[in-house]
UniProtKB/Swiss-Prot annotation:
CC annotations in GO: extracellular region
Keyword Secreted listed: yes
Domain of life: Eukaryota
Protein name, UniProt field: Toxin Tco-gamma
Expression across tissues: Expressed by the venom gland.
Domain notes per entry: Has the structural arrangement of an alpha-helix connected to antiparallel beta-sheets by disulfide bonds (CS-alpha/beta).
Species name: Tityus costatus
Amino acid sequence: KEGYAMDHEGCKLSCFIRPSGYCGRECGYKKGSSGYCAWPACYCYGLPNWVKVWERATNRCGKK
């Protein structure tokens, strides 16, 4: 599957001020095949189905 990588708070993983290759590495840590900075957040490809990705309908970023 593909989608925006999330941090531990459910927010999109920001790549705004990250070095080149950051998103590819982060997506790899999540078992994805590749990823890139879709400014300003990391977008991943080839993720296993069990990995949670950001979705507008279930967005919990900044909410308690």
